[in-house]
């Protein structure tokens, strides 16, 4: 499972309140949530997110448990999130909504804003097409990969009995 897009780079400890502020949790439409993704940190994020790979530092998605954070990023058009580490609940929520995630050590030191990236979730690597550098990460395996390939948990469960 591969995706390709331009990098949008942020730092460490981006919490779910930054990814989607609480005042927008009344909405369920992914497109509406996407219009407000990352609003406190980067009001221009929705304009640059479509077809992008979000790159972040440590503890991405920490804070309160809200699946709307992953839905908002997907609704904004983010193709994948690559981070040095993830809060476990965000990581699982992303997989459950069909948003590819990959953990890659030191990725924020090796990727710049606007770099063209290819992310291979199953292979567990990121290829920086701008620099030619390949960064090894932690590949998804087993059930999490199957859920992601199905497009999320709901789709996975719909097809599991077949």
Swiss-Prot record:
Any one of the GO BP annotations: L-leucine biosynthetic process
Catalytic activity: (2R,3S)-3-isopropylmalate = (2S)-2-isopropylmalate
Top EC class of this enzyme: lyase
Gene3D superfamilies, per the entry: Aconitase, domain 4
Keywords assigned by UniProt, alphabetized: Amino-acid biosynthesis, Branched-chain amino acid biosynthesis, Leucine biosynthesis, Lyase
EC number: 4.2.1.33
Gene Ontology molecular functions: 3-isopropylmalate dehydratase activity
Stretches assigned to coiled coil: none
Known pathway: Amino-acid biosynthesis; L-leucine biosynthesis; L-leucine from 3-methyl-2-oxobutanoate: step 2/4
Subunit architecture: Heterodimer of LeuC and LeuD.
Family: Belongs to the LeuD family. LeuD type 2 subfamily.
NCBIfam families: LEUD_arch (TIGR02087)
Name of this protein: 3-isopropylmalate dehydratase small subunit
Organism: Pyrobaculum neutrophilum (strain DSM 2338 / JCM 9278 / NBRC 100436 / V24Sta)
């Amino acid at each position: 499972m591969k995706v390709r897009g331009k990098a949008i780079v942020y730092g460490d400890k981006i919490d779910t309140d930054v990814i989607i502020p609480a005042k927008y949790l009344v909405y369920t439409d992914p497109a509406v949530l996407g219009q407000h993704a990352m609003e406190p940190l980067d009001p221009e994020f929705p304009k640059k997110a479509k077809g992008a790979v979000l790159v972040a530092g440590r503890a991405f998605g920490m804070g309160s448990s809200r699946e709307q954070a992953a839905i908002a990023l997907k609704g904004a058009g983010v193709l994948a999130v690559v981070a040095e580490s993830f809060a476990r609940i965000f990581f699982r929520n992303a997989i459950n909504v069909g948003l590819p995630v990959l953990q890659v050590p030191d990725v924020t030191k090796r990727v710049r804003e606007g770099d063209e990236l290819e992310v291979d979730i199953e292979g567990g690597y990121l290829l920086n097409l701008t620099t030619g550098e390949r960064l090894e990460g932690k590949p998804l395996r087993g059930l999490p990969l199957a859920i992601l390939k199905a497009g999320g948990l709901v789709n996975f469960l719909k097809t599991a009995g077949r």
